[in-house]
Each structure stands twice: as structure tokens, then as C-alpha cells.
């Protein structure tokens, strides 16, 4: 029950951040299109800082085992759910924004502060495992779908700052190399902005929309159902039958972290990707806002369901 309450509080905080972005545009201080600069800062600066900082922990056999369990669970989620969501997209004729909003969760913005508040800072590393796996899919699958590119540009993918930060973080962890305290503290400070910055972008975009159009669009409610109910239930079944929780003494906690990452609202980075590559960023932002609001109810319920079945 404590986790469920903290979940609701964290999501409510994110929604207030969206409101701040909304108000700064409505007050005439900024325009909704000004959010594009902040989107690029989140994608190419803040998220890499989160990843590098998370991997600055001591190398121990227990940590490695936990990382492997978290990685296996994260990869299982990403691969199986990709096929499932793609199938749903064909059946229900989902467009690029809808498919990516259903598939990609807002783990980068919500999971780190949530895990820190509920489980402690020492567990943030395992939440970043899911983020890292999702980032690989994000900069391959999501980028291709949103940008409408015919094929993958592997050179751009490999040289992407987010992908580089994942490999550098892993390398530093396994070699035991620790960054100077000044550098690591700087990474932590910049990385802590990921939630507020992403939510402010969403709010700024939301301010430029027609509310009646948003809430009259029945597609948004269907996408919200898929993102917050259908996908979490599929993930719950997968995690239950995989028995990955039995592979480590901390297995149940590791599975909880991965499940929390899966059941978050639609990724605000989809909105930012749409901005960068000229897709429908306002529709993506509307989905993000509606799913964030609805997740105040759905996330605690899903966590309670997980605790009942594991």
C-alpha cells in the first residue's frame, strides 16, 4: 500500500510540472514551439547524464547478478511487447504516434525518482537497466517509425550520445573506474532535471492545443487503455510465467522495478522525438497528458495486482 501511495504522489507531482509548462505559455512568457530547444536538451544532455551517473556504483557479484536479472526482464518486456503492440497496431490501425505512445513508457522520467523515494538510491542502477534497454529500441525502432525513414542509419545510431553513454557507463562499472566526485555530482545534478524538464515540455505543447479537440478525440482514450491497462497486464503475465524473480535473492524487488518502468504513462520522449523529426508532437503530448492523469489511478492498482500474483 505504501508503494501505491508514493506512486500516486510522484505522478501528481509530474502533473503539476506539466501545469507549470502550460501556464508559462498561457502567460505569454514563452510560445509552445519554444519547447523544441528544451526537448533537445533532455534527449541529448540530461538523459545521458542520468545513465552515466547510475552506473557509478561498486562492482560486486550481487550487483552483477541483479543487473543480469533486471536486464533479462527488461529485454523480455521490450521484445515481446514490441511484437504485441505491433500486432495491435495492425488490428486497430494505429498511426506512428499511437504505436510509439503505447509501446514506450515514461520510465526515464518517473522510475528514477520513484525508486529513489520508495526503495532507496542504491536501487536506481537497476531502473536504469530498463531505461538503457528501452533507449536502444527508442533510437532504432521509435526513431524509424516517427521519422518515417526507410531504413536504419546504423552509424548515427552507434554514434548517438545516448547509446554512447550506455556503453561508457557499462564500461566504467565493469572496470571499476570511478569518475571524480566533482564530475559525478555534476552528472547527478543535471540528471535530476529529467522529470521536470520533460514534463514542462509536455505542458508547453499542451498549451497550444484545442482542449475540446483533445478530449473529444475518442482515440486518445483507447490509446490510454492500451498503454495503462492492456500492456501492463501482458507484462504481468510475462513476468509471472518467466520465474525471473526466483533467480536472485532480490528478485521480487528487481521485478517490481522493471514492472514499474513498464506501467508508467506514455513516454514524453515520444513527444520530443516528434518535435525533432516533424511528426504530430501535439497529439503525442495530448496522449502523454491524458495517460499521466489516468496513471494516478492505474499504476497503484497494477502494483497491488503484481504483489498479489508474485
Please state what every model-predicted region is.
Residues 1-310:
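Alpha-helical transmembrane segments of multi-pass small-molecule/ion transporters
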Amino acid at each position: 500500500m505504501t508503494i501505491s501511495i508514493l506512486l500516486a504522489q510522484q505522478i501528481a507531482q509530474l502533473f503539476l510540472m506539466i501545469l507549470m509548462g502550460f501556464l508559462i505559455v498561457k502567460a505569454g512568457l514563452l510560445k509552445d514551439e519554444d519547447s523544441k530547444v528544451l526537448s533537445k536538451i533532455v534527449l541529448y544532455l540530461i538523459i545521458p547524464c542520468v545513465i552515466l551517473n547510475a552506473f557509478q556504483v561498486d562492482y560486486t557479484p550481487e550487483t552483477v547478478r541483479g543487473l543480469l536479472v533486471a536486464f533479462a526482464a527488461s529485454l523480455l518486456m521490450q521484445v515481446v511487447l514490441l511484437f504485441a503492440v505491433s500486432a495491435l497496431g495492425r488490428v486497430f490501425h494505429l498511426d506512428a504516434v499511437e504505436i510509439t505512445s503505447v509501446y514506450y513508457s515514461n520510465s526515464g522520467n518517473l522510475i528514477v525518482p520513484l525508486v529513489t523515494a520508495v526503495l532507496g538510491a542504491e536501487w536506481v542502477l537497476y531502473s536504469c537497466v530498463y531505461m538503457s534497454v528501452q533507449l536502444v529500441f527508442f533510437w532504432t525502432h521509435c526513431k524509424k517509425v516517427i521519422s518515417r525513414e526507410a531504413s536504419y542509419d546504423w552509424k548515427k545510431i552507434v554514434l548517438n550520445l545516448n547509446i554512447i553513454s550506455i556503453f561508457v557507463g557499462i564500461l566504467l562499472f565493469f572496470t571499476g573506474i570511478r569518475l571524480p566526485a566533482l564530475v559525478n555530482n555534476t552528472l547527478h545534478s543535471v540528471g535530476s532535471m529529467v522529470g521536470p524538464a520533460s514534463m514542462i515540455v509536455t505542458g508547453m505543447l499542451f498549451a497550444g492545443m484545442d482542449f475540446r479537440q483533445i478530449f473529444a478525440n475518442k482515440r486518445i482514450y483507447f490509446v490510454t487503455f492500451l498503454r495503462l491497462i492492456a500492456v501492463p497486464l501482458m507484462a504481468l503475465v510475462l513476468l509471472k510465467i518467466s520465474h525471473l524473480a526466483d533467480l536472485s535473492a532480490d528478485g521480487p524487488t528487481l521485478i517490481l522495478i522493471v514492472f514499474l518502468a513498464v506501467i508508467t504513462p506514455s513516454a514524453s520522449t515520444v513527444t520530443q522525438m516528434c518535435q525533432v523529426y516533424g511528426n504530430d508532437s501535439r497529439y503525442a503530448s495530448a496522449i502523454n497528458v491524458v495517460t499521466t492523469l489516468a496513471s494516478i489511478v492505474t499504476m497503484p492498482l497494477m502494483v497491488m495486482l503484481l504483489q498479489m500474483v508474485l
